[in-house]
Amino acid sequence: MYFPIVALIGRYQDTGLDAPLTALAQMLTQAGRRVLVEAETARNAGVSGYPVADWDEIGRTATLAVVMGGDGTVLGAARHLAPYGVPLIGINHGRLGFITDIPLQDAHDALGRVLEGNYQAEDRMLLQGGVWRGEQQMYSASAVNDVVLNRAGRGGMIEVRVELDGAFMYTQRADGLIIATPTGSTAYSLSANGPILHPGMNAMVLVPVAPQTLSNRPIVIPDSGVLNMTLTAMGRVEIGASVHFDMQTWSDLQPGDRITVQRAPHIIRFVHPEGYSFFSTLRRKLHWNLMPQATDNLE
């Protein structure tokens, strides 16, 4: 049997999630699967009648995690479950949905095919890093999409010295700097004119946000290196600077603080229904104006 124990995870703030989650739980039970509901999802979405589990229990026992919500919901679930190796499948109950690629109305059909073994798996990298003040580590976190260093208030720019494996790259004056994974290259990085990286690439991309020097362009680097970014100045920034690991924020950066970023030792495994195509997702989500040929598989 494929995926005998399935965990359900939903976006806590979403209204109206109880009905589709309950229907999904019923469908899974009828298919002979044991269903676990993540604790906050059960509490806030009102899903009852199924065993409730915290992240650790899900990580130790679940063979598949079904995440209903937007990409942000998947990011949070992925950070929790990546160390356990639990694969995830995303059902879009949000907005754009690059990671939650299954529309809500197709959830039962798509999940049914996956449970029958008609699926393809895709491994993606995470980032890990921290904030150092001298020899003391002030903060640590992981990120699926990106690590973003930016000014926290109005006015002025931040100045950052960037090194890769100890080799000086540049000193950047900008509103911010994005370090994105291939997964994150279609998120904030894309809106800052960064390139799209194929998810199979072993790479990261550094994208400046409103740099002072217009010749400062995004640069793609191997994910095998360690980035060190030292905040050298904050100009006339009124409040300070912050660093964000996905949606996790450290907002007390001071001049001289060092931010380290590198590839995490574990990966995320996403499960897609058979026939999934990254390029098809790009065409749909970004509305690329292609002239398809009759032989093209568009979906």
UniProtKB/Swiss-Prot annotation:
Function: Involved in the regulation of the intracellular balance of NAD and NADP, and is a key enzyme in the biosynthesis of NADP. Catalyzes specifically the phosphorylation on 2'-hydroxyl of the adenosine moiety of NAD to yield NADP.
First-tier enzyme category under EC: transferase
Cofactors (names): a divalent metal cation
Protein keywords: ATP-binding, Cytoplasm, Kinase, NAD, NADP, Nucleotide-binding, Transferase
NCBIfam families: PRK02155.1
Main location: cytoplasm
Chain residues that bind NAD(+): 71-72, 145-146, 173, 175, 186-191, 210, 248
Pfam family, one: NAD_kinase_C
GO cellular component, one term: cytoplasm
UniProt name for this protein: NAD kinase
Record-annotated active site: 71
Tagged with keyword Nucleus: no
InterPro entries referenced in this protein's UniProt entry, alphabetically: ATP-NAD_kinase_N, ATP-NAD_kinase_PpnK-typ_C, NAD/diacylglycerol_kinase_sf, NADK
